[in-house]
Amino acid sequence: IHENGYETKISSFDDYLTRANELHQKLLIEIKTSHKDSPQMMEYFLEKYGAKIKVYGHQMQSLDYKVVEKVREYDIDIPVYFILPYNSVFPRTVATGYTMEYSTLDEYFVTKLWNTEQKLYVWTINSSESFNKSFHLGVDGMITDDLERIKEELVTAQEDPEYSDLLLNKATEFFVY
């Protein structure tokens, strides 16, 4: 491909996964489906990549709940997240957890999640405001386009003496419900 005077090749998923494994870089692999996919697409994908995904500790996510179910059927130990573009009702799923757009995240959802063993990732965390909201609600992971900024925000938040108070308050709230 060519853009702004630069030229490069698009890597295949095989090459990308191999390189990530060499670098010990864990991936969150998103499976996007369409009506044109074969009914066996996930079986083929998991047959080819499932073992490596598990061994190297990668995770998966999809907006398509059938993908989540297929991954769980293949191997319950591969973490797979169900993408929720909106927070309207609390879902009951077999997913490891949920990936949610941060602006729809609220305390009600997080509180309901405490009663499960599921985790919560939020996207796209690129500002102090989105970081603070996500951090104070206790999400398990943040998806960002600005890793350096979020690392700095995390260090600052953890150095804040109110951080330990926040953890204590969250633990107390947990036992009140």
Model-assigned labels for residue ranges:
Residues 1-79, 116, 172-176:
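Metal-dependent phosphodiesterase/phospholipase catalytic core, i.e.
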Residues 3-8, 79-177:
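C-terminal active-site rim and adjoining tail of enzyme catalytic domains
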